[in-house]
Amino acid sequence: MTTQPFFYVYILESLSDPTRHYTGFTEDLKQRVEHHNAGSVPHTAKFRPWRLQTAIAFTDRERALELERYLKTGSGRAFARRRL
């Protein structure tokens, strides 16, 4: 029996500037957070270190990508601030 992969939508909070957040998608959450904290991701390197604020697991890749796209909109960011 093979295990079904998970797809993650995550929100990071900068520990150096708590007003900074980053929303992303990955299949390997631990490794992706490590990449952000190592400075391997140009968009987030300036505001290291990061802490994982929220992670949501999906079994459906497309649903995960839909949520990521939504959370990157103005109304999605407002939703995340209030609910996540």
Q: Language-model segments: what does each one mean?
A:
Residues 1-43, 48, 55, 62-77, ...:
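GIY-YIG nuclease catalytic motif and its immediate N-terminal context
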